[in-house]
């Protein structure tokens, strides 16, 4: 439940950050930095509180404990990547640096749409515990990674040709890199959640069989 909540919050923060940087909305970005730092602290608290949870899972087998640790680690990586997007974005706008170019804004808009679709599918899977969409998520992730790679290459070409603003380019490339990290770790979290659920269901089946024998 906590993982689902934090993933949904991360989805909202990312989308609002991309919109706020388009509009150069300083106040919104300041609030989003605070929210992303809050979710990062929450993920670290989950990590710090692993031992009590692992003790509760002790009787459930080593595999469940391992997958739970992985889930918490991936969630922390997602939250950290989000901070690495919101913080420099706010600082860029707060320091009155030049905003993103039309090309950068257009590319980020498409990437934001892709991220929203991927995270929407992941959140739906986490809530319903129905993993039938997992191959579709993998396919969407690969398409997004190809888009990010092509977009990064285009930006490097523009930089080499002396086009655009250096600080805006650095911010743009940072957002692209951290977006890739966010999606990569979200997919990893989903895989860990699937294995966790499968082992939990298998163990519950064994427990029911033993009790009925």
Task: Briefly describe each language-model feature range.
Residues 1-213:
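Cytosolic, long alpha-helical scaffolding segments
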């Amino acid at each position: 439940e906590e993982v689902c909540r934090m993933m949904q919050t991360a989805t909202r923060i990312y989308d609002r950050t991309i919109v706020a940087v388009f509009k150069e909305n300083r106040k919104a970005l300041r609030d989003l930095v605070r929210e992303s730092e809050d979710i990062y602290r929450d993920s670290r608290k989950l990590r710090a509180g692993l031992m009590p949870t692992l003790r509760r899972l002790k009787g459930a087998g080593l595999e469940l404990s391992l997958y739970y640790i992985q889930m918490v680690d991936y969630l922390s990586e997602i939250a950290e990547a989000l901070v690495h997007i919101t913080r420099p974005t706010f600082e860029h706008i707060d320091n009155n640096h030049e905003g993103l170019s039309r090309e950068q804004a257009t590319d980020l808009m498409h990437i934001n749409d892709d991220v929203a679709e991927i995270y929407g599918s992941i959140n739906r899977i986490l809530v319903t515990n129905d993993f039938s969409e997992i191959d579709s998520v993998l396919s969407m992730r690969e398409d997004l990674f190809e888009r990010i790679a092509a977009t990064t290459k285009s930006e490097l070409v523009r930089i080499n040709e002396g086009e655009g603003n250096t600080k805006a380019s650095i911010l743009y490339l940072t957002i692209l890199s951290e977006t890739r990290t966010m999606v990569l770790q979200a997919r990893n979290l989903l895989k860990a959640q699937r294995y966790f659920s499968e082992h939990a269901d298998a163990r519950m089946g064994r427990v029911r069989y033993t009790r009925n024998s």
